[in-house]
Regions:
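C-terminal edge and immediately downstream basic/flexible tail or linker adjoining helix-turn-helix-like DNA-binding
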Residues: 1-8, 17, 125, 139, ...
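DNA-recognition helix of helix-turn-helix
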Residues: 84, 88, 143, 155-179
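Amphipathic, Lys/Arg- and hydrophobic-enriched alpha-helical face
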Residues: 30-48, 65, 127, 178-179
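Sigma70-family region 2
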Residues: 19-20, 43-46, 56-74, 93-94
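Structural recognition of an alpha-helix C-terminal capping motif at a helix-to-coil junction
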Residues: 39, 53-60, 73-85
């Protein structure tokens, strides 16, 4: 239990120092969270310079908007939300966010049960291979934990479109899993 308290204390001290614009605290914050946040960026943008740019832009926003963090929730969660929003803005700017509203009605449980047999790296590759719209909604819903209403607002789409994109993503993942005989 001391480790958890210690980690929370360190995080709180980092936040306070970042609010004072302490460069060493900003560097420590970057080092502490950059790996996890790069994984978030890659989930939406793939590996490459765009993900790296979004990571850097996201951290710039973290440090310039740190005064808005109210310390009631998780600092990591707050940073993650900024990274997701930055990734979505980059996708919009690139003109890559296209959604179609069709429901295929795949059974959720079938796909999720199959995931349990895969290694994380294999699953990430399958998710990465999805079309951009499907991948984006799948990541927001299944990995980040947003609901369809929140996703619709974030992406500027109808709630039904979010649901159908998730259904299509799960359907494609199921097909890919079947090919792997999972």
């Amino acid at each position: 239990m001391t480790h958890i308290f210690s980690s929370q204390t360190i995080e709180r001290e980092l936040v306070q120092a970042c609010k004072r614009r302490d460069r060493k605290a900003q560097e420590a914050t970057f080092k502490r969270f950059a790996g996890k946040m790069m994984a978030v960026c890659k989930r939406y943008l793939g590996a490459g310079p765009l993900a790296e740019d979004v990571l850097m832009e996201g951290f710039m926003k973290v440090f310039t908007k740190i005064d808005l963090f109210q310390e009631q929730g998780s600092f990591e969660g707050w940073i993650r939300r900024i990274m997701v929003n930055e990734a979505l803005m980059a996708l919009r700017k690139e003109g890559k966010m296209k959604f179609q509203d069709t429901d295929f009605g795949y059974e959720i449980g079938q796909v999720e049960d199959a995931y349990m047999n895969l290694q994380v790296e294999e699953l990430n590759k399958l998710i990465e291979s999805l079309p951009l719209g499907y991948k984006t909604v799948f990541n927001l819903y299944a990995i980040e934990g947003y609901n369809h209403q929140e996703i619709a607002e974030m992406l500027g789409i109808q709630e039904g479109t979010s649901k159908s994109q998730l259904s299509r993503a799960r359907g494609l993942l199921q097909q890919k899993l079947n090919k792997l005989h999972v």
